[in-house]
Design a protein with these regions (language model features):
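Secondary-structure capping and domain/repeat boundary segments
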Residues: 1-210
Length: 210
């Protein structure tokens, strides 16, 4: 509010006015070019401005921008989500009320770690290590091909990923049972008289009695 004493008939120049968060829309009554013969009050007209808060989720799910009047209460959106990461907040504070400017907030993320486990069978763990999500595996990080008496290693199931997924991953060795040849020789002439191929672990007594 400003007051000024002006002589009757003197030229009047309306002042320049500004108000944070508002656009000046003129005066409620026309300002005369010269001072009338009475005290006069002129009231400014204002239009509230709208401003926008934009959310850069940096790879997370999209969050709609907030556009509303200056000074109105701002409701914080739900935290964004991003595969393989944990939301760690914004790089600035979401205001309680809309400020008199546009602003952009960027999401901050902590990368998650997940466990890669190699199992020899349903019970025996060969190795178990944690890796960052998206970590690209190198050959030296893979478990060596295991061995097991009487069995041949056939690979891993499920197939090993090239990168660490956004979940713990367990793969189990697959085996094929080995077969072996048993040869029977005569005790006098050492002559081969019978051969049989059997799987590892078969009951030898049954084989001998055949």
């Amino acid at each position: 509010i400003s007051r000024e004493m002006v002589d009757y008939g003197s030229a009047i120049t309306a002042p320049t006015v500004a108000k944070e968060g508002y656009t000046f829309g003129g005066w409620e009554a026309d300002v005369p070019s010269t001072m009338p013969a009475k005290d006069t009050t002129f009231t400014a007209k204002w239009t509230v401005n709208q401003y926008t808060i934009t959310f850069n989720t940096d790879g997370g799910n999209k969050i709609a921008p907030i556009t509303q009047d200056f000074g109105t209460a701002v409701e914080s959106p739900a935290d964004p989500t991003r595969e393989g990461y944990t939301f760690a907040g914004w790089d600035g504070t979401i205001p309680a009320t809309m400020p008199a400017k546009d602003s952009t907030l960027k999401a901050q993320w902590d990368i998650n770690q997940y466990t890669l486990t190699f199992k020899k069978n349903d019970e025996e763990v060969i190795s178990s290590e944690k890796y960052d999500y998206g970590h690209v595996f190198h050959e030296n990080e893979m478990a060596q091909d295991p061995d097991s008496v009487g069995y041949s290693f056939m690979g891993w199931s499920p197939e090993l990923p090239t990168k660490m997924p956004a979940e713990d991953f367990t793969t189990t060795a697959q085996w094929t049972i080995n077969s072996y040849k048993i040869s029977f020789y005569g005790d006098l002439d050492n002559k081969l008289f019978h051969e049989v191929t059997v799987e590892y672990g078969s009951d030898l007594e049954d084989i001998i009695n055949e």
